[in-house]
Amino acid sequence: MNDDSIDLVIEVLGGIDPGREYIKALLSNGKSVITANKDIVADCGQELVSLAIENNSCLYFEAAVAAGIPVLKPLIESLRGEELTRVSGIINGTSNYMLTSMEEGSCYEDALATAQELGYAEPDPTNDVEGIDAKYKAMILSLLCFGVSPDIGEVFTEGISKITKDDFDWASRLDKTIKLVAQIDNNLDGFNARVYPVLIDQKHPLASIRGALNAVVVEGENIDQLVFSGPGAGADPTASAIVGDVLSACHQLGSNQSNWYPLRKNKGNNRNFEDVQSSWFIRLSVNDEPGVLASIAGTFGEHNVSIESVIQEGRGDQAELVLVTHEAPEKDLNNSIEQITSLSAVTTVTSVLRVYI
């Protein structure tokens, strides 16, 4: 760290410590650092970037987010003059592989077992299936795209462990599929980042991303949509991204330039997640008796949630109701569901999923 003959260091230790302290020390000593460690960049990326700027050094982390997709450098360089409004993506290959398997007919347990056999999922798959890995990557994208470094607790996260094959069957009937999507918005309503499974229209670019592939969709005032897709992780894509950062770093060092990442500034306030609006897909099991649908619709109406469509299928003395709502805030939908759950005619609230808008 104190060797003046060393200009560039690659950190691939994994975990947060001791790598974090090593990177801080290296940047403080004017050395540039390349890391593939999303945990560190998500945890203290803004601090590390500031440290690099103060000490005329650079921090490179292309391999930390969707390593096989060159997305960070275009965001930093090619789009530096663009006013970005939304970045959304499939940024965890394990969960996307599992959801693709479920769309093709597997149950959740079989999809997970196969992912583990193939090495996509760890023996403890929590970080992948509960959206934690995608959350860290979303935090990095938030920093680069909008100049916001949210705390871990500020990024609402919901995983895929409650998704069932029946959800996919219904999604298909609605010309949609289900994806775990990280979504970051920065507009007149404010800034918000979240990760959760959504029903997404089959025509949307993210719907066609299958298996362990990743994709990032960038939207701005002048560019409409740009889509970056490819392998998100693995030894070869990660190594390729690191080598690319090495070459970029060598160019920077050779030209005696630094601070190649001019961070954008957040122009809005952080928006409370409860105020974020979504359309909703709700699946209920109810007693097949007169007045049930009217009672449920009335409850939604009391909380200002408007129903767009309803499908009802009878199953003996029970019926399955599938409702899709117009856009409504999280808090209003949650209040509606809480009250609907207490209705005597409602047997089970089977699924509540957001619809990508």
Regions found by a protein language model. Give the residues of each.
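A structured beta-alpha segment of the ubiquitous adenosine-cofactor-binding alpha/beta core
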Residues: 1-8, 12-18
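A conserved regulatory-domain signal marking ACT and ACT-like small-molecule sensing domains
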Residues: 246-357
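Rossmann-like NAD(P)H-binding beta-loop-alpha module
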Residues: 53-133, 140
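Rossmann-fold NAD(P)-binding glycine/threonine-rich loop
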Residues: 13-29, 36-77
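Substrate-binding/catalytic subdomain of NAD(P)-dependent oxidoreductase enzymes
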Residues: 101-102, 110-208, 213-215
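Conserved active-site and cofactor/substrate-binding residues in soluble primary-metabolism enzymes
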Residues: 4, 43, 66, 70, ...
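A short hydrophobic/small-residue beta-strand
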Residues: 32-34, 307
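ATP-dependent carboxylate/acyl-activation modules
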Residues: 204-275, 279
